[in-house]
Amino acid sequence: MCSSDLIESVKIAKQKNLAMVAGFCWRYDYAKRAVFGKMLDGTIGDLRAVYGTYLTGPVKPMPPASSRPAGMSDLEWMTRNWYNFTWLSGDGLVEQAIHTVDWMMWAMKDQPPTSCTATGGRQIKAEGGNIFDHISVAYEWPGGVRGFIAQRQITGCYGENSFYAIGTKGNAYIHRGHYTTDLAGERTWKYEGPTPDMYQVEHDELFASIRAGKPINNGDRMVTSTMAGIMGRMAGYTGQQLTWEQALNSKEEIAPQNLRDWNGKVEVPPLALPGRTKFI
């Protein structure tokens, strides 16, 4: 499925008055809603830049080829180790750190970035697969507004999953709490409200919207956030600056062609080499 298919699916869901709730669960977290509200209501002034992190260890390390059971097909082996293949997981930026990308898009009122550049690669040798273990992306919006995402999955490193928003009147943080400060760094607000389970809130609001005849449709922002992550991955893999339109109209096919044959030979691209891997 390509971006145009998803966009069309969202359109059809709206026409049929169907609910479409995305997996961007933090949008249903009370504390996140409150702090993003501060970013968007003028409390910290005009937003000039944001920085989001998802620094953690490997999610599902690729096992050695010697552990592969005799007779197991390529597709089964890849499916069982799905995280390590771009065509199955999207890479760490699009699978795990996509939640941080969604935070960035939330702060930017879900407006697509105009362009991005990225650096990344695989620092620690893997037993197989073709995903990076780190990538950093710099996005740009009109007026010189910037968004920066840092993602890493390497054992033994500092871990963090935070978000920092810099405004003309102050700053907002998701880092050991949810709060704002003035330009001097003095705290001006801290979230101290209820913290119900965001997954439960997500389901409660979904069901309530259906019963009320006004089904929630998160489709547009789901597509935009996911595409922003894919755009960052493309920029990281190729080493090129990419525009939103380039990414949206990419002709790249990352899924193998012979997926109908469970026992067939499956070839996947090698690990991307920035500057050599071409944008398609």
For the regions a protein language model found, what residue spans apply to each?
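Predominantly a Rossmann-like dinucleotide-binding segment in NAD(P)-dependent oxidoreductases
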Residues: 14-22, 26-129, 162-164, 171, ...
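Active-site beta-strand termini and strand-to-loop segments that position acidic
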Residues: 138-143, 166-168
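C-terminal helical cap and adjacent loop that interface with cofactors, partners, or active-site loops
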Residues: 76, 89, 95, 99-113, ...
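Phosphate/diphosphate-binding loops
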Residues: 147, 155
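Catalytic-core regions built around general acid/base machinery
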Residues: 5-13
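Short, small-residue-biased leader/transition segments that mark boundaries at the very start
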Residues: 1-3
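Short catalytic-loop micro-motif centered on adjacent basic/acidic residues
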Residues: 20-23, 148, 218-219
